[in-house]
Amino acid sequence: MLEKFSSKFNVLKHSTTNGLLSVQINPNDIYEAVLFVRDNIGFEILADIVCVDNLYIDKEKRFSLYYIFRKISSENLCIYIDIDINQSVKSVESIYKSANWGERECFDQFGVKFENHPNLKRILNHKDFQGYPLRKDYPITKYQVLYESDDLVGEMKNEMQRAGLASEENDEFKTKYTFLNIGPSHPATHGTIRNFVALDGEKIISCVTEIGYLHRGFEKACENHSYAQIIPYTDRLNYCSAMLNNVGYAKAVEEALGLNLPDRGIFMRVILGELARIIDHEVCLGAMFVDMGGLTNYWYLYNPRERIYNFLSKLTGARFTNSFARIGGMANDFYDGWKEELLAHLKDVEKGVDDTMILIEKNRIFLDRVQNICKINANDALSYGFSGPNLRASGVSFDLRKDKPYYYYDSFDFSVPVGSEGDIYDRMFVRFFEMRESISIIRQAIKLIPEGKISVDDKDVFLPSKDQVYSNIESLINHFKLIFDGIKLPNGHFYSASEGANGELGFFIFSNSEPNPYRVKLRPPCFYALNAFSSMVQGSLIADSILNLGSLNIIAGELDR
């Protein structure tokens, strides 16, 4: 791949870390390089765009932009460029639709400008925000209050002009159509998301999405905390499957350190991660049934979920935000009798799934609401950066557990459910079938889980036990040293991805070998799924858009960070 790329472009630097080939090129070549990567090398997905402020790094240019690409055959590629503080970059939105919001985020947080971008405006921070918060010289304690919200009329006019529904010369569209805000504080949005729609009757003609209402500055906080201190923050990303966030982040740090976990710790992560996936899907589907008036279905899914929460509470001490993973292992081992309890809970989940599917499979009212509604085809889904159940619903069989296996997933017997139409029906039923597969994986893992340690025996990574600290001076010193000095990664950038409940959960880490990460960038699957929402709902009814939003399973904590 490097040889093919080098034959076309001047490669300034290249390196390979943990299987990720990274290539530095001239900034002027970025558009042609991205086009070449898609059309000649075959990378279907632009997974993320990451900006790093080099203010305290020994680099000549102020910013570096990293473009992370993925093939559904599991290969990754990173192309990066260095640019000056006032240097603009060609937009690649016309090549990959996922670049639209990815570039907007770089502009919002760092001030990087992209030429020919169709809507270069802030996305996570509000319209009156001054400065660029992820620049190194922006103080973390500085906050800015928004006193008047954006009416979004100007953005709506631009969207309608591009669609030929409005004219630049006049504002006739304001009287021709009805305008409605769906959110940001509405029970049907399942989170703080605002969709401003233009209506012809009940049909949506155009839609503008505004996010950022739950933006807490997760990535800025990461730069000001040690690697271990970040774990509780990950719980608050996709809070419906907190354990998967813990595991995804810990996995990224461990891969950068070259750590190999004990088998029992790995199996614990598989079991608890699949439980989190089940909970997440139950929340998604149960909430959708409430939206369409199916309360019986809701309780069939929510009651077993409650029992799993009780299990997690007993194990971790917390129902919702568990903070149970550790860099190098797990916080504690399973308690006595956990297998019997968990197997009983899995039977409850299985029965709830079966009973729900019996109620809806031939229900004409249900089928009319979800079949052939808000469809997205495979090519568009890939271009928008879809992953997980939403991508598989469009007919693309891609699952990181299968295609780039980790944690012994290649030794488990499970299938990857795939849809065909990319409609609401497929997005729902892919999740139903995935719950069955997760149950199967957990049962297999319960049979196979070995005895032994749950964490690495490495004083530079994992804290000694309390018994050791209280009885051994060397352990006390190791504890003291790790707390004060922290975990230190090698210099460089690292990207790690795991299969979250909503798709590819990626963590990009830039390290300068200090106790705190120099830069952490989260790749939230929700972010790129919602980017496509506006195009998906055009021509549909208001009621359809509510179900479509639910079927994408947008979690505001992960979306806004």
UniProtKB/Swiss-Prot annotation:
Entry GO terms, CC: NADH dehydrogenase complex; plasma membrane
This protein's record includes keyword Cell membrane: yes
Enzyme class: translocase
Keywords tagged on the record: Cell inner membrane, Cell membrane, Membrane, Multifunctional enzyme, NAD, Quinone, Translocase, Transport, Ubiquinone
Catalytic activity of the protein: a quinone + NADH + 5 H(+)(in) = a quinol + NAD(+) + 4 H(+)(out)
UniProt region (NADH dehydrogenase I subunit C), positions on chain: 1-152
Pfam families xrefs: Complex1_30kDa, Complex1_49kDa
InterPro entries assigned: NADH_Q_OxRdtase_suD (IPR001135), NADH_quin_OxRdtase_su_C/D-like (IPR037232), NADH_UbQ_OxRdtase_30kDa_su (IPR001268), NDH-1_subunit_CD (IPR026662), NDH1_su_D/H (IPR022885), NiFe-Hase_large (IPR029014)
GO molecular function ontology, one term from the record: NADH:ubiquinone reductase (non-electrogenic) activity
Region (NADH dehydrogenase I subunit D): 176-561
Topology of the protein relative to the lipid bilayer: Peripheral membrane protein
Main location: membrane
Record's subcellular location: Cell inner membrane
Documented EC number(s): 7.1.1.-
Assembly information from the UniProt record: NDH-1 is composed of 13 different subunits. Subunits NuoB, CD, E, F, and G constitute the peripheral sector of the complex.
UniProt family annotation: In the N-terminal section; belongs to the complex I 30 kDa subunit family. In the C-terminal section; belongs to the complex I 49 kDa subunit family.
Function: NDH-1 shuttles electrons from NADH, via FMN and iron-sulfur (Fe-S) centers, to quinones in the respiratory chain. The immediate electron acceptor for the enzyme in this species is believed to be ubiquinone. Couples the redox reaction to proton translocation (for every two electrons transferred, four hydrogen ions are translocated across the cytoplasmic membrane), and thus conserves the redox energy in a proton gradient.
NCBIfam families cross-referenced by the UniProt entry: PRK06075.1
Name of the protein this chain belongs to: NADH-quinone oxidoreductase subunit C/D
Organism expressing this protein natively: Campylobacter fetus subsp. fetus (strain 82-40)
